[in-house]
Amino acid sequence: MADPVEQFEIHKIFSLGHIGGQEIAFTNSSLYMLLAVGAVALLMLGGSAGRRLVPTRFQSMAELSYEFVVNMVRESLGEEGMKFFPLVFSIFMFVLMANLIGVIPYTFSVTSHLIVTVALALIVFLTVLLYGLYKNGLKFFRVFVPSGVPIYILPLIAMIEVISFLSRPVSHSVRLFANMLAGHITLKVFASFVTSLGALGVAGIAGAALPLAMTTAISILEVLVALLQAYVFAILTCIYLNDALHPGH
């Protein structure tokens, strides 16, 4: 049976040179991140070019994506939070496309790598922190002091809130990474069962029916997980950004 973790290995495609003794390389991970960005650009440019009263498929998909994120941001952050729409939309579409591309057989899932999800989570975390301090000054630290907390337990609650705030990039990134990693490993294991049993002949082919059915079911589930995890990552981004706009609420 093939190693189910082998699909996550990063391979160098070509070198970009050396900086400080360290090689900078263009890898398969870099390639699929560019493909995800390119797919988003193609969808949005294709959907906005030559708009029609009766929308084309590209136009319908682009408008649906746009309206979905607009409604998410408006409901979570209000009109004041619409300034963050470009950030939330970019993150949502990148994660969505990267997830969906990763579901295609023999491709590479960039969101199954923790370094990618941590980078996205840190962008959100630093945006919340820096904009919160810029907009609210020291009042931003009210986010660590929930209103209505009795004074005698306030130090304990404040400490818990600080730890919770600092751990956001961890939970935000690990949730996406773990879900995508687990799904791809499970799919690879069942697909390997099908291949191994099919190689045994007629009896093996009959025995491969159940793993094949499970592989098909998991593949469909993986598409749903790809959509759901992009939404979860985006809605958590909105929830965290709300603290920058309204600390202490």
Curated annotation (Swiss-Prot):
A Pfam family: ATP-synt_A
Keyword terms, alphabetized: ATP synthesis, Cell inner membrane, Cell membrane, CF(0), Hydrogen ion transport, Ion transport, Membrane, Transmembrane, Transmembrane helix, Transport
TM stretches of this protein: 30-50, 84-104, 114-134, 143-163, 193-213, 220-240
A Gene Ontology cellular-component term: proton-transporting ATP synthase complex
Protein name according to UniProt: ATP synthase subunit a
Gene3D superfamilies: ATP synthase, F0 complex, subunit A
Function: Key component of the proton channel; it plays a direct role in the translocation of protons across the membrane.
Gene source species: Afipia carboxidovorans (strain ATCC 49405 / DSM 1227 / KCTC 32145 / OM5) (Oligotropha carboxidovorans)
Subunit structure: F-type ATPases have 2 components, CF(1) - the catalytic core - and CF(0) - the membrane proton channel. CF(1) has five subunits: alpha(3), beta(3), gamma(1), delta(1), epsilon(1). CF(0) has three main subunits: a(1), b(2) and c(9-12). The alpha and beta chains form an alternating ring which encloses part of the gamma chain. CF(1) is attached to CF(0) by a central stalk formed by the gamma and epsilon chains, while a peripheral stalk is formed by the delta and b chains.
GO molecular function: proton-transporting ATP synthase activity, rotational mechanism
UniProt similarity note: Belongs to the ATPase A chain family.
PANTHER family: ATP SYNTHASE SUBUNIT A
InterPro entries: ATP_synth_F0_asu (IPR000568), ATP_synth_F0_asu_AS (IPR023011), ATP_synth_F0_asu_bact/mt (IPR045083), F0_ATP_A_sf (IPR035908)
This protein's record includes keyword Lipid metabolism: no
CDD domains xrefs: ATP-synt_Fo_a_6 (cd00310)
Main localization of the protein described in the UniProt heading: membrane
Membrane topology: Multi-pass membrane protein
Compartments, record wording: Cell inner membrane
Disulfide bridge map: none
